[in-house]
Amino acid sequence: MIIRSPEPEVKIVVDRDPVKTSFEEWARPGHFSRTLAKGPDTTTWIWNLHADAHDFDSHTGDLEEISRKVFSAHFGQLSIIFLWLSGMYFHGARFSNYEAWLSDPTHIGPSAQVVWPIVGQEILNGDVGGGFRGIQITSGFFQLWRASGITSELQLYCTAIGALIFAALMLFAGWFHYHKAAPKLAWFQDVESMLNHHLAGLLGLGSLSWAGHQIHVSLPINQFLDAGVDPKEIPLPHEFILNRDLLAQLYPSFAEGATPFFTLNWSKYAEFLTFRGGLDPVTGGLWLTDIAHHHLAIAILFLIAGHMYRTNWGIGHGLKDILEAHKGPFTGQGHKGLYEILTTSWHAQLSLNLAMLGSTTIVVAHHMYAMPPYPYLATDYGTQLSLFTHHMWIGGFLIVGAAAHAAIFMVRDYDPTTRYNDLLDRVLRHRDAIISHLNWVCIFLGFHSFGLYIHNDTMSALGRPQDMFSDTAIQLQPIFAQWVQNIHATAPGVTAPGATTSTSLTWGGGELVAVGGKVALLPIPLGTADFLVHHIHAFTIHVTVLILLKGVLFARSSRLIPDKANLGFRFPCDGPGRGGTCQVSAWDHVFLGLFWMYNAISVVIFHFSWKMQSDVWGTISDQGVVTHITGGNFAQSSITINGWLRDFLWAQASQVIQSYGSSLSAYGLFFLGAHFVWAFSLMFLFSGRGYWQELIESIVWAHNKLKVAPATQPRALSIIQGRAVGVTHYLLGGIATTWAFFLARIIAVG
């Protein structure tokens, strides 16, 4: 008989077949709620259906069930993303001029959409060069594809099919992990394991495999492309991977294989893992060898980070211990209790993630132009403007979302009885001081930033240019920004002795990179005009934060409504008979925050668009003379409100306004239509519910008279529904108007 030690018990972390798969639910709209499942009595039903369909908290109070629904929905989201990506790649394969663009990216514009002639729409197919007629695209996919080493439309086609397969796989996973093997709550709360897997797996191995792809596939293919080799002559990706001699012809150290790695002679690899800084003068993008080096380094960091947290082996960090040790002399209990909050409230978790991701997205927007990562991206001005604008809007929305979910956490998940003297409790206890100080800052910034402009407008109108704030009269130079620029410009050889050039040409240093006679990037001068508009940025950002933070800190209670938590996340007023208590819910703060976010981002993208056209983008003559698109007018024109209206909005709108009859005419129609959508929003925002209810009742009377009254009783939108429809159209109209204005302008002149 053999005596064995008892086997360690394996934790079962899934439930088998918890929810029956049935399509019957699909036929019962509102099946998740007892009230909605009864069907519509009034037209309010359809609005409530939309409002609550994804509010899993309202379907059940069981955290495990909520977690499973969210987890499953994430797979659905990934499936849609793969489907969308597949569509992008399919368009590149089937309807684009990618191969032609690859052969001459400086003279041929990217296009992946050809409009069918039905009743004259083929006018939209403009000549993008090389004899191809289509819509010029500004998504940056062509540049991304070239950087990743795609040389033919067949490769794009195969990738599109691959993405479709992945979309199907994700759809299956979403079904499987809800209906067949659903994780237990403990699995969702195992944060150390999650951190290890996400850091080492997603970020670590993800970066490592991308670095591997770049070294073995992208670098050699881009070497050939830069040297002018016909894409059809270049070996296929798998040939580089399977045949080391091919790579060794381009990078001799490949002949030695992994020997330098194991003998610690790493400098051998310096020919394809570089640390150059600056831009490649051939393509105007970052050096791809720098990018490969970066991803390898990032991979190492994340692989190490993914082994830091304590799971089955009893070594490493525990998140709870880290958080509870995190307290200083002035912070009471510090982060004690935060672990419990973040493992039981997904709103709190989501709020943090949205805030981080939103900030990161805005950082990405700025890096995309200052350090353009892909070949021929920097000289494609339409794409540069689109990428910046897109990432700024997305970042703004994510940050407002962070405040929204923080407020939902406060209302639904925060338990004041168990929290005492931790950081969150301390912030809530001195919220009046925080909000009143922030309010003072907003008033100060608003009056002073606008005051500088109004002063300039007045002096300009009185014909007293010598009394204006400008680079040629009373200077307000942004000395701190210039100091930061200078530090970075002089870093190579000083604080960064290994680098040959500074991280970005925008810092200064005098050099300019031009590709095919177009400026890719040059040092960006900052002056009084930038100082003024930066204070407008500070103002709009602080007001957005004031509104959102007030919504979070006063989500549960306020002096006006001490029992606000009982009223929920969104409510119109504190009941009848209490005047002056409308628009105080956390939801209303998010609503107002969205408008200020829109203000803030609009000023940023206007600043960027004009500054780049004035001081960066343009052409360069054989003698080295740079001619900018708007001839450097930013410094003198943007220092008055009138200048912004006349020389930016009005002057640059001429392309979109005069686009009729040209291939840009769709932008003219969008410009008009989006203005209409925006104006339509005002009808919802500036009108009371009672007005519409009265109108509806007289229309219902007429229907009754004619015996055609519907069974479902018509109702005016509730106050909150009306505001939701209003803000949606306001933002949609505003963003689409800006999009049409920017693109018609930059495609025409860029």
UniProtKB/Swiss-Prot annotation:
It is a multi-pass membrane protein. Chlorophyll a binds at M683, Y691. InterPro entries: PSI_PsaA, PSI_PsaA/B, PSI_PsaA/B_CS, PSI_PsaA/B_sf. It is found in: Plastid, Chloroplast thylakoid membrane. [4Fe-4S] cluster binds at C573, C582. Chlorophyll a' binds at H675. P700 is a chlorophyll a/chlorophyll a' dimer, A0 is one or more chlorophyll a, A1 is one or both phylloquinones and FX is a shared 4Fe-4S iron-sulfur center. The PsaA/B heterodimer binds the P700 chlorophyll special pair and subsequent electron acceptors. PSI consists of a core antenna complex that captures photons, and an electron transfer chain that converts photonic excitation into a charge separation. The eukaryotic PSI reaction center is composed of at least 11 subunits. PsaA and PsaB bind P700, the primary electron donor of photosystem I (PSI), as well as the electron acceptors A0, A1 and FX. PSI is a plastocyanin-ferredoxin oxidoreductase, converting photonic excitation into a charge separation, which transfers an electron from the donor P700 chlorophyll pair to the spectroscopically characterized acceptors A0, A1, FX, FA and FB in turn. Oxidized P700 is reduced on the lumenal side of the thylakoid membrane by plastocyanin. This is Photosystem I P700 chlorophyll a apoprotein A1. It comes from Agrostis stolonifera (Creeping bentgrass).
